[in-house]
Amino acid sequence: MFKSGFVTIVGRPNVGKSTLLNYIMGEKLSIVSNKPQTTRNNIQTILTGDDYQMIFVDTPGIHKPKHKLGEYMVNSAKESTKDVDLVLFLTNPDEEIGKGDKFILETLRDKKCPVFLVLNKVDESTQDRVAKSLEMYSKEFKFAEIVPISAIKGKNVDVLVELMKKAMPEGPKYYPDDMITDVQEKFVVSEIIREKALRTLRDEVPHGIAVDIIQMKQNEIGTYHIEVDLICEKDSHKGIIIGKNGQTLKRIGENSRYELERFLRSKVNLKIWVKVRKEWRDNQLLLKELGYKANSKK
């Protein structure tokens, strides 16, 4: 009997959703950074075995939106929980149950599919804190399974995957065996560059950063030539991104090139320009150009 289904991963920003997905897949398909709200698009990732296929939807964190981009991210996350076969609610034992957690759980209240509580980052917590967190969440919601894990170290992730397989309904193989994602190569490239920018800049520049790929082509010997605009919202941010004598931008480029060559398995020539687009996160036309398309309301 072949089993297949759709799995969505939800939780507050920065609880480790993308890290978990990347560990399961063994591929860097979803942007990972220490800043919240780094995932901006739903990414369908396909895990296929001999007798199963699970299609994961990696979502932005659900939060109170502050701008048009924030509204897109929240609507995208909510939309992803519709018509799925399993929901993984990811949280952190060292944080109290907040309004954000309760808001997410309330949106899951009427789901007919199973909801797993996945307690991440247990390696950074204490046994008492983990036990207290499990008790608190058990009172808030009736979970089909409760699994403590460490996504970054892979602890108990194999147990989680086995439980997920069991939860999948009987179904067809939706995608070919060798297909691991439904996103275009350019999207992954832009996400890698954005991650490196966020990591390099740390808290110096907020989330008003986007990557627009101007050109991406491969020559006859296999080398990729990639030109991108790194978009920010303020002139002051542009100066920070470039850095003294261009050193910060150079570091972003070097880190991006290394990761891109691993992903593309080829040599990469990368050129990055920094452009200011004031209040781009509230510009619906520019958001569409950058690939952020709002989900249709059902």
Curated annotation (Swiss-Prot):
Domain spans labelled Era-type G: 3-170
Lineage: Bacteria, Bacillati, Bacillota, Clostridia, Eubacteriales
InterPro entries: G_ERA_dom (IPR030388), GTP-bd (IPR006073), GTPase_Era-like (IPR005662), KH_dom-like_a/b (IPR015946), KH_dom_type_2 (IPR004044), KH_sf_prok-type (IPR009019), P-loop_NTPase (IPR027417), Small_GTP-bd (IPR005225)
Region annotated G5, chain positions: 149-151
Chain positions recorded as GTP binding sites: 11-18, 58-62, 120-123
Any Pfam family: MMR_HSR1
Residue numbers spanned by region G4: 120-123
Location of the protein in the cell: Cytoplasm; Cell membrane
Membrane topology: Peripheral membrane protein
KH type-2 domain span: 201-278
Region annotated G1, chain positions: 11-18
Protein name: GTPase Era
Quaternary structure (record): Monomer.
